[in-house]
Amino acid sequence: MLNRRNFLTAAVGVAAAGGLAACAKKDEGASGSSSGGGSKTITLGFSQVGSESGWRTANSQSVKDAAKEAGYTLKFSDAQQKQENQISAIRSYIAQKVDVIAFSPVVVTGWDAVLKEAKAAKIPVVLTDRSVETSDESLYVTLVGSDFTDEGRRAAKILEKVLEKAGHKGAVKIAQLEGTTGAAPAIERAKGFKEVMDASHKDDWKIVVSQTGDFTRAGGKQVMAAFLQSNPDINVLFAHNDDMAIGAIQSIEAAGKKPGKDILIVSIDGVKDGFVAMSEGKINAIVECNPLLGPQLMDVVKKVKDGETVERWIKTEESDFMQDQAAAALPDRKY
């Protein structure tokens, strides 16, 4: 069972860190400044998954902006979607004796060794966006992020509305574009969607083909082209993020079909480009996954540094959007 389902609270004692060290080679750089009074600023080491999507870019910028606003020193690294890069970055942060380590894990498993090293160094770890599986739940303090399983459920439920609005009758043949293999969002979004499908639509809905598009537009385009060759009668696409859906739209149009009509599309994230596609009638519904976690993360980091008790899982607030809401919502999208 994934640890994001554990709702226990945990108190963490944090030892005072020594002087600040220079940024490691793999860090993109440090930002932030001490906020007066001679008090030592908080130093946060943050390891990001990568820059594979518009969502991730917005997430990274939110972290950087919020750290600057809070006056923290931020050591930021981009793992380029490789677990070994994240482990290396975390070890670098341990060596630099940062106050708190935060990271968005590339995959769910394989973190115990480096997390034990952080615990031994008395540096608390905060997960952002994604969960991990560990043998010891004390290896991290909290998760700040979305309920991906519920996002999958919400996607299935909003598909019910999309099908009704489209007047669809008959079998629902679904193509699923999965996120990165082994990543928490991919595992949990698929799980939540299937829960609703099996409970309410066992006889009329079927996932006829499912494959990873690695959360990228290029991946979505390539995999959707293959889907249409092997299963030309697909009438629904469930994409684990907007970028893959946008890539898939190119392949759908290249095949002479109309996205949003011949193939109904539901995706997850809510990035601005997704709303543009939805306002053009090419995506039917979007389940929001909020990337702007920076302010919440900085608040949690301060509490953890001060030894306060925090919730085991701090969820983000999110909404769902149908196609007819896109034009009105688009000007207010911040990412």
Where are these regions (language model features)?
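N-terminal secretory signal peptides and thylakoid transit peptides that target proteins
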Residues: 1-15
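Bacterial lipoprotein signal-peptidase II cleavage site
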Residues: 21-34
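Hinge/cleft segment of the Venus flytrap/periplasmic-binding protein
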Residues: 40-42, 177-185, 196, 200, ...
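Extracytoplasmic "Venus flytrap"
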Residues: 43-62, 66, 75-88, 92, ...
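Hydrophobic alpha-helical segments within soluble ligand-binding/sensing domains
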Residues: 44, 86, 143-172, 219-221, ...
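Short beta-strand elements at the ligand-binding edges of bilobed clamshell
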Residues: 76-78, 134-161, 176, 210, ...
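Hydrophobic alpha-helical
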Residues: 103-120, 193, 209-276
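Flexible loop/hinge segments that line or gate small-molecule binding clefts
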Residues: 109, 113-150, 173, 271-277, ...
